[in-house]
From Swiss-Prot:
HAMAP family: Transaldolase_2. Belongs to the transaldolase family. Type 2 subfamily. Pathway: Carbohydrate degradation; pentose phosphate pathway; D-glyceraldehyde 3-phosphate and beta-D-fructose 6-phosphate from D-ribose 5-phosphate and D-xylulose 5-phosphate (non-oxidative stage): step 2/3. This is Transaldolase.
Length: 325
């Protein structure tokens, strides 16, 4: 399919040396991480125990960063051939989520992490809050690829695009001799969360497991219509809880061109060999169906609630790691 990319929403040190290589050989083109994923890896995998012991005496955040940066560097190296051959092959790492309402601290942390990792195919993950749009702009302007995350509303996706695109324009303006300098243009993804909508709104909806798909389709249309190939829609939160849906439901339903889907391992396994292009619905079709399922006020409230909840969950996961270290 034209410019569709499937990424793995998981990272763990030993996994990167084994199962991850198998996934890459079967068409996986990138990977993502978040505080919850690192919490699960660091606190539950024995491979980190010796590393943590050797780092004892350092500040807990420094220990976390050494562990996380090491994994991100390893993933970036495994993905490097895809990056240099196909301009894909990215791995994402999120800044400290507790900084989401502080522009200055977020920007400083993002630049510091990018410098410490020192890999071109790393995307710095920035939550889409009011304080963060300036961060996205500055990173793109400085040639640092960005994963704008925790997008639930059309308004968020639009503000993310505006910030990222403005930074991209400035980067290009400042790098007129781009080809001569061999400087790569930064890439960005706008991560639209999908299944969380359905888990929240299914009890109130007249049709089950459709709101997340329709909402994501709407944001995708907005991003795709801008015709900027360096800024793509990414569908996140595409795992299925329970047995009422196929594990790859949210991959198959959002199989759109020039998009990315980052999925958990069970969804990727279920999806193998099912690459069938899906035609996105047009906006008027989306709104017609949405209005039949649930009210606009309920959707808007859900966007705000899900963003607040997502920020809180990532902050808790991050603090849990630090407490355990």
């Amino acid at each position: 399919m034209k410019n569709f990319s499937l990424w793995c929403d998981f990272i763990e040190n030993s996994f990167l040396d084994n199962e991850f290589l198998n996934l890459l050989s079967h068409g996986i083109n990138g990977a993502t991480s978040n505080p919850a994923i690192f919490k699960n890896a660091i606190l539950n995998s024995p491979i980190y125990k010796d590393k943590i012991l050797k780092l004892k005496g350092k500040k807990t955040k420094d220990i976390y960063e050494e562990l996380a940066i090491s994994d991100i560097q390893k993933a970036a190296d495994k993905l490097a051939p895809l990056f240099y051959q196909k301009n894909d092959g990215f791995i994402s790492i999120e800044i400290d989520p507790r900084l989401h309402d502080n522009t200055t601290l977020s920007l400083g942390e993002a630049k510091r992490l990018y410098s410490a990792i020192s890999k071109e195919n790393v995307m710095i993950k920035i939550p889409a809050t009011k304080a963060s749009y300036e961060v996205m702009y500055e990173l793109m302007k400085n040639g640092i690829s960005v994963n704008a995350t925790l997008i639930f509303s059309l308004e968020q996706s639009q503000k993310c695009f505006e910030a990222l695109n403005a930074g991209l324009v400035e980067f290009r303006k400042n790098n007129i001799a781009l080809k001569e300098q061999n400087t790569r243009t930064p890439q960005a993804v706008i991560s639209i969360f999908v299944s969380r909508f359905d888990r929240l709104l299914n009890p109130k909806a007249k049709e089950q497991n459709r709101i997340g798909i329709l909402n994501a389709n709407l944001a995708y249309n907005n991003i795709y219509s801008k015709n900027e190939p360096n800024i793509r829609a990414l569908f996140a939160s595409t795992g299925v809880k329970g047995d009422d849906l196929p594990k790859d439901y949210y991959i198959k339903e959002l199989l759109f061109e020039n998009s990315v889907n980052t999925a958990p391992l069970d969804a990727i396994e279920a999806f193998k060999g099912k690459m069938h292009f899906k035609k996105p619905l047009m906006n008027f079709e989306i709104y017609t169906e949405l209005n039949q399922i649930i009210s606009q006020s309920e959707r808007e409230k859900a966007c705000n609630d899900l963003l607040s909840d997502g920020l809180e969950q990532f902050c808790i996961a991050f603090e849990d790691i630090l407490k355990a270290l």
